[in-house]
Design a protein with these regions (language model features):
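Active-site donor-binding segments of glycosyltransferases and PAPS-dependent sulfotransferases
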Residues: 25-76
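Conserved donor-binding/catalytic core segment of Leloir-type glycosyltransferases
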Residues: 165, 169, 180-206, 212
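A short, Lys/Arg-enriched amphipathic alpha-helix followed by its capping loop at the start of a domain
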Residues: 12-24
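A short, active-site helix/loop in glycosyltransferases that binds the activated sugar's phosphate group
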Residues: 118-177
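Active-site proximal beta-strand in glycosyltransferases
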Residues: 61, 77-97, 111-123
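A short, glycine/small-residue-rich beta-strand->loop->alpha-helix junction that serves as a flexible
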Residues: 1-12, 33-39, 206
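Nucleotide-sugar donor phosphate/pyrophosphate-binding loop at the beta->alpha transition
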Residues: 94-113, 137-147
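Short hydrophobic "strand-cap" motifs at the C-terminus of beta-strands
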Residues: 1, 124, 196-200
Length: 213
């Protein structure tokens, strides 16, 4: 389940299906638009529009952190009978607010509810994992009542599973050209050329200012 199917989320789920062909996959995805509405309404949409598909016999439920997993399993009890894995591509605690963006607590709480009901939680990087834990702790101190201890136990027990990257064919020629340049550089100055890869969107939330520095 991919509730906010942005390019990186789409790539991830498609690669899972391609690299694990021994499994019979059923994929459901919602367009990456109207973020606040999408993160809060996806369970309601799927429960009403995909009820028959979601109540078929499945062995495992794999959902991105944008999925309101707690609500979905409540609306479709059959999904509560199979194990679920929650995968964090990012977390709202590490997402920069920006000058025009007001703080909204709800998009931060929805994934935490999902953590509470998932059998296994995984993050795409150690930074994503640690910043989520730190952010949840900071939020807990500000709330009228502290977040449950069980939540932090599950976050601490979570895994780090990087997204497998498969270079697209059009990059092969470019990489080969870079290797030729590197070889020429080695013969000229005795050191290999440095190759830098930027594997993020070119937007403020990805830290382009830090890269420039």
């Amino acid at each position: 389940l991919s509730a906010y199917d942005a390019a990186s989320h789409k790539y991830w789920r498609q690669q899972l299906q391609q690299q694990l062909p021994e499994f019979d996959w059923t994929q459901l995805a919602l367009p990456a638009r109207h973020f606040n509405w999408r993160i809060r309404s996806n369970a309601m949409q799927w429960a009403s529009q995909e009820y028959e598909r979601l109540t078929q016999s499945h062995d495992l439920l794999l959902a991105t952190s944008m999925v309101d997993l707690a609500t979905l399993r409540g609306l479709i009890p059959d999904l509560a009978q199979i194990p679920s894995v929650l995968y964090f591509h990012e977390n709202q605690f590490a997402y920069p607010a920006g000058q025009q963006r007001k703080e909204n607590v709800e998009p931060r709480l929805v994934p935490l509810y999902s953590v509470m009901c998932a059998e296994q939680v995984a993050f795409n990087s150690a930074f994503n994992r640690s910043s989520c834990i730190e952010g949840a702790l900071a939020l807990s101190r500000r709330l009228p009542e502290a977040l449950p201890t069980r939540l932090f136990e599950k976050l601490e027990a979570s895994l780090v599973l990087p997204v497998p990257l498969v270079p697209p064919p059009e990059l092969s020629a470019i990489h080969h050209q870079h290797e030729n340049i590197a070889s020429a550089g080695e013969s000229a100055i005795g050191t290999a050329a440095l190759e830098v890869v930027w594997n993020h969107r070119w937007e403020y939330d990805k830290g382009i200012g830090l890269l420039a520095e």
